[in-house]
Amino acid sequence: MGLFNLFRRKNMSEEIKEYLAKGAIVLDVRTLEEWNEGHTEGAEHIVLTVIPLEIEKIKSWGKPIIAVCRSGARSGQATQFLANNGIDVINGGPWGNVDQHVSKG
């Protein structure tokens, strides 16, 4: 099982890199308090519960989305909602998963 998780992580990492290369926008769906504790530079912040109200704004970005949160649960919910609304999106999981790639350029 440990090997499976390692393989899955590598796939997620590669997918994140691919999306960043396509100019994806990082969408952080955590609370304002969590966001203020640290976030990926250049990320957009829309709290999960507000996403349905901001769907037209998100669509207007016209770019793929990498949804992130603290653990991957809320970003998973956001990913499902955005995908159901025709947006090219992946669940980046915890924001640190994406941040490590953004910081390295």
Give each language-model segment a name.
Residues G2-A24, L32-P64, A73-G105:
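Rhodanese-like catalytic fold shared by cysteine-dependent sulfurtransferases
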